[in-house]
């Protein structure tokens, strides 16, 4: 590695809006990062996520008009 071209790599305090915080390393100058969500409050990690099955266009069409694909006469 070349000398004197890389940024300073310092310990950084990451704090979440939920109040959780942890220490990591980063090149941020002031040494603090504020995050909106973290692993303690994100629904995916806490198990409170809601899985929405919206279905596709074909499923919505079949629900509206039924499965009459082969019964149409010409």
UniProtKB/Swiss-Prot annotation:
Entry keywords, A to Z: Metal-binding, Ribonucleoprotein, Ribosomal protein, RNA-binding, rRNA-binding, Zinc
GO biological process: translation
Required cofactor names: Zn(2+)
GO MF annotations in UniProt: metal ion binding; rRNA binding; structural constituent of ribosome
Pfam (any one): Ribosomal_L31
One Gene Ontology cellular component annotation held by this UniProt entry: ribosome
Keyword Ribosomal protein part of the UniProt annotation: yes
SUPFAM superfamilies: L28p-like (SSF143800)
Textual note on the cofactor: Binds 1 zinc ion per subunit.
Keyword Ribonucleoprotein: yes
Family: Belongs to the bacterial ribosomal protein bL31 family. Type A subfamily.
Subunit structure, interactors included: Part of the 50S ribosomal subunit.
Function: Binds the 23S rRNA.
Designated name of the protein: Large ribosomal subunit protein bL31
The organism of origin for this protein: Streptomyces griseus subsp. griseus (strain JCM 4626 / CBS 651.72 / NBRC 13350 / KCC S-0626 / ISP 5235)
Source organism phylogeny: Bacteria, Bacillati, Actinomycetota, Actinomycetes, Kitasatosporales
């Amino acid at each position: 590695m070349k000398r004197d071209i890389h940024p300073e790599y310092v310990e950084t305090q990451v704090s979440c809006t939920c109040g959780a915080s942890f220490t990591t390393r980063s090149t941020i100058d002031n040494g603090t990062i504020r995050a909106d969500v973290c692993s303690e409050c994100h629904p995916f990690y806490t198990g409170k996520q809601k899985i929405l099955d919206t279905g596709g266009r074909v499923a919505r069409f079949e629900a509206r008009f039924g499965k009459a694909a082969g019964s149409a006469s010409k």
